[in-house]
Amino acid sequence: MERVTPRTLSGFMELLPAKQVQMERMMEILRDSYSLYGFTPLDTPVIESAQVLLAKGGGETEKQIYRFMKGDTDLALRFDLTVPLAKYVAANYGQLTFPFKRYQIGKVYRGERSQRGRFREFYQADIDVIGDGKLDIINEAEIPAIIYRTFTHLGLSKFVIRVNNRKVLNGFFELLGLSESAGDIMRTIDKLEKIGGEKVKQLLMDECGVEEEKADEIIRFISCPGTSADKLSFLETYRGRCETFDLGLDELNTVAGYLPAFGVKEENFAIDLTIARGLDYYTGTVYETTLTDYPEIGSVCSGGRYDNLAEYYTDKKLPGVGISIGLTRLFYVLGEQGLLSDELVTAPADVLVIPMTEDLTFPIAASTTLREAGVRTQIYTEKKKVKQKFAYADKMGIPFAVIIGDDEAAQNMVSVKDLTSGQQELMSPAAAAAKIKAEMDVRNSVTVIREK
């Protein structure tokens, strides 16, 4: 028989057990955060009709998707979680209660060129609030609070949630007589951090047809310095000249005004007029979140307000606001920067029960007592030397061992050994469960991310 060399395709990630535990812990924190704000979990098929996924049209998306025929059916793998959400809300409109708040953590697929930190299969973690006909601005103010809570519970403190409003930008372009080019201009200024102001100015002139004087004015406007309060004051100087601009400024003031009540610290929030988000469907507040010490990573959480999520599937107007975290990429870059905590307990069990008796009745009963107390317990029954059993626990990173020999079994007692300190005590199974549970509660309080 010819054996096949096991390999993983380029652009696809497989993790060893300890790293997988870290990833799962991150997902748990995201789920907990999203649930605290009243979001319900949603799962949609990985494979959809290509007609449904590409209802908006082809372009770059069609070039990147994984698409195939099964019989006469044209199928594709989902490339994000937004289009499946639009389909889901349109298909189940009559059975949903609005505003509909959902979160979804799932794999998506894009046939991009594989490169460092970029994947073809990756997890996204999305939240969206969908309204029926209208959606109150307070939902746009709540989004930064959710980002703040999520990132702080992951263990991050040095991050900034950067916020802007597309109506402010559209209104400003209208004042310059550039409304027809607004979409192209936004996609261009969205590149500011990557290529710098001079190159953006050149692109505005060369590709968007903007006159040099107006290109300079755009760069000056979006590069306004100062605090969030300074920028709001700067924007007030334009009030009264354009209705769209004024509406966007009102929305920006509302979002910024509610953040202290939502518990968002001032140092973790900034109004940033350079944030445009290149996607055309954003119509109001837009968000990007960056790590203060690692600006080269770029945005790790982004999104915004849109006015008609499902226009390609229904005539119902379904406005919404949402954000997305590229979880696989975030996990990868955190690992690259050494920010994933090595103190996080990644072992599959809290305790390894090591029977040293022929009769396993008491060791099994003791294991049951431990599990009923919430202690993750593995019983080692392989016929190996004691030294090999402890070596197994050490290699797996299991912090405690419960040793049960004939003497312990005769007394209905167990020996609990802390495999870090080497200390060993004789006690009842119930006492052992309480001791290990209390110790593990402390050890499990370590965050996934540890900032330097």
Listing of model-derived features with the role each one plays in the protein:
Residues 42, 46-75:
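Polyanion/phosphate-binding surface patch
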Residues 63-72, 178-200, 291-293:
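Acidic, His- and aromatic-enriched active-site or binding-groove loops in soluble protein domains
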Residues 58-59, 176-178:
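Short secondary-structure boundary/capping segments
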Residues 33-42, 71-73, 94-97:
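Short, solvent-exposed loop/edge-beta patches enriched in aromatic
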Residues 1-19, 69, 179-182:
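Auxiliary tRNA-acceptor-end handling modules of aminoacyl-tRNA synthetases
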Residues 19-37, 48-49, 82-94, 102-157, ...:
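Positively charged, Gly/Ser-enriched RNA/tRNA-binding surfaces
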Residues 161-172:
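Glycine-rich, mobile lid/loop segments that gate access to catalytic sites or pores
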